[in-house]
């Protein structure tokens, strides 16, 4: 999907509006949210991580790209919501000392899209809080 390269380019330029334009064009072409998450957002963020690891971009650039990706997810979330509900629940979040929450956020969104009731706890959640979450 060449859109992932275009999306990545806009991420690295810090152009949130252009990133959202890429996503909206894909939605208009009836590309599924799941495919956008997998083949555009995930793929682009993996490349951002590789660039940072290789010293080709700064921490600030990586954080900006992540921030833009999260804002795109926030806009896409409204398209994920469904009236279909099933009798299943999930508590989703990152383990202690894990601050990279975009991947689990996408998983959470897809569970919701499939009718699950999801409690997304975000980054760096103590294990005891998962066990004791009370979201039963």
Predicted regions located by residue number:
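Long amphipathic alpha-helical segments
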Residues: 1-84
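Conserved mid-sequence domains
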Residues: 86-136
């Amino acid at each position: 999907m060449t859109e992932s390269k275009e999306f990545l380019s806009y991420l690295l330029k810090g152009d949130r509006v252009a990133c959202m334009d890429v996503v909206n064009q894909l939605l208009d072409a009836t590309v599924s949210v799941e495919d956008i998450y997998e083949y555009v957002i995930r793929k682009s963020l993996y490349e951002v991580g590789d660039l940072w690891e290789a010293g080709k971009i700064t921490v600030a650039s990586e954080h900006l790209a992540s921030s833009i990706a999260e804002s795109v997810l926030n806009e896409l979330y409204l398209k994920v919501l469904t009236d279909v509900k099933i009798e299943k629940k999930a508590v989703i979040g990152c383990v202690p000392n894990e601050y990279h929450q975009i991947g689990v956020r996408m998983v959470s969104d897809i569970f919701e899209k499939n009718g699950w009731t999801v409690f997304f706890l975000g980054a760096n959640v103590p294990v005891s809080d998962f066990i004791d979450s009370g979201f039963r």
